[in-house]
Amino acid sequence: MNVQQLKKRAAAKALEFVQDDMRLGIGTGSTANEFIRLLGERVADGLRVTGVATSQYSEQLCRKFGVPVTTLEQMPELDLDIDGADEIGPEMTLIKGGGGALWREKIVAAASRAMLVIADETKVVKTLGAFALPIEVNPFGMPATRRLIEKVADDLGLSGEIILRMNGENPFKTDGGHFIFDAFWGCILQPRLLSEALLAIPGVVEHGLFWGLASRAIVAMADGQIKVLESSDF
C-alpha cells in the first residue's frame, strides 16, 4: 500500500468517531483532504454535522463536497477536531503546519473537546524534529524575530538552518497574513521548553509544536492494520 492509500484508510477510520449533530473542527493538509471528501459522502447519505475549517482551502473543499461549515465566531465550542500531523511523537506531541495553517489549526484544536489525529505510519516518530518545525511570524521586524529564534535554539542546544518559506519568488503568506520560518533542527528533545521560549518572542505568532491537545491518533500501517493510539501508547 502506498502512502496515499494509507491516508485514505486513516481518514475512513476517523469517520467511526463522527456522530450526528457533532460540531467538528476540520483540519488542513493531504490527510485532512481525504477526510473531507469521505465526510462529504456521509453527509450526502444523511449524516448531520457542522464543521469549522482550519484554512480557507479546507473551507473551500468542504463546500465542494457538501460539508456544512461555519465559523468559530458562530460556533465557539466544538466536539471533535480531526486533523493530520507532520510528526507524532512521545505523549502525543505533534509537529504540524506543513500546510501553513498551524495558527488556525491550534485555535480550532483548543476550542475542541477532543482532538483526533489521522496519519500514516511514517508520521510516528520516537523524537520530534526530522520534519522542519514551522514558526509563524509577523512580517514586521522579521530579521529581529529571526535573531531571537536563533538565540532560543542556541540556548536549548539546537542547531540547523532556519529558512523563510517561499511561494515562488515571494514569501509564503498564511491565511492570517503572516510569514513562516521553517526550522530544520533535526532533534527536539525538550518540546515544551522550546514551545514556551518561542512564544515568549514578541514577533512569533505561533509555532507548530502541539502538546496537550491531541487525545488519540489513528495510524494506518503498511501491513493493513489500523491502530488507534492513546498518549500512553508512546
From Swiss-Prot:
Pathway(s) of this molecule: Carbohydrate degradation; pentose phosphate pathway; D-ribose 5-phosphate from D-ribulose 5-phosphate (non-oxidative stage): step 1/1
Record carries keyword Nucleotide-binding: no
Ordered alphabetically, the record's keywords are: Isomerase
One Pfam family for this entry, by name?
Rib_5-P_isom_A
Q: What would be an example GO MF term here? A: ribose-5-phosphate isomerase activity
A GO term (biological process) for this protein?
A: pentose-phosphate shunt, non-oxidative branch
Keyword Isomerase part of the UniProt annotation: yes
SUPFAM superfamilies assigned to the protein according to its UniProt record, in alphabetical order: D-ribose-5-phosphate isomerase (RpiA), lid domain, NagB/RpiA/CoA transferase-like
Explain the purpose of this protein.
Catalyzes the reversible conversion of ribose-5-phosphate to ribulose 5-phosphate.
**Family indicated by similarity:** Belongs to the ribose 5-phosphate isomerase family.
This chain belongs to the protein called Ribose-5-phosphate isomerase A
Q: What is the species of this protein? A: Bartonella quintana (strain Toulouse)
Where is the organism placed in the taxonomic lineage, from the top? Bacteria, Pseudomonadati, Pseudomonadota, Alphaproteobacteria, Hyphomicrobiales
Record gene name:
rpiA
